[in-house]
């Protein structure tokens, strides 16, 4: 299974119209494959939308996208609002739940870490051992690594009912000594991070994941 994460930077004050057009066009596009999630940024880089699509593999992605374009079902007419577009193919870790329609948020914290080249196996070993303890405090939405697009990236997404709940949950996990993951505490080789960023996302009205 793969997830395509498409991130678009859009012009200021265009979000409502962009989401409206995506939502309307998706009604025709969905017969080819279901949208996994559609978010916009609330905190972090502003004027940004992210849509996530789940596919069996790259071949299925190519086939579905070609059929949708040929049918005129996709993409939506939003070109006048788009400043920048990027697409990344993500592979889920073993600890990552399959994303399905439902309510987990409405606040989603997306944290993107860039690790040193070659350190993915070390990072994965630490996180797959550490996350089960973290899950005692709140659920995980996704844990992915990049296969195509920006390389050496690790993305983890955490849903919360409120921003206060986010802060309280992180404080409790930290106080319990289980978060953030520590390679030394787990007796595993240390991986190196070269960059970190986070953003708070909220779902559009038509997003299957709320």
Question: Language-model segments: what does each one mean?
Answer:
Residues 1-58, 138-139:
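The feature marks the first
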Residues 4-7, 107-115:
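N-terminal beta-strand motif that seeds the catalytic metal site of vicinal oxygen chelate
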Residues 6, 18, 51, 61, ...:
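Hydrophobic pocket/interface hotspot
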Residues 12, 54-60, 116, 159-165:
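Helix N-cap motif at beta-to-alpha junctions
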Residues 14-35, 67-74, 117-142, 165, ...:
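Short amphipathic alpha-helical segments
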Residues 34-50, 54, 72-107, 129, ...:
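Glycine-rich beta-strand-turn "strand-cap" elements at beta-sheet edges
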Residues 56-66, 77:
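Short hydrophobic interaction/assembly module
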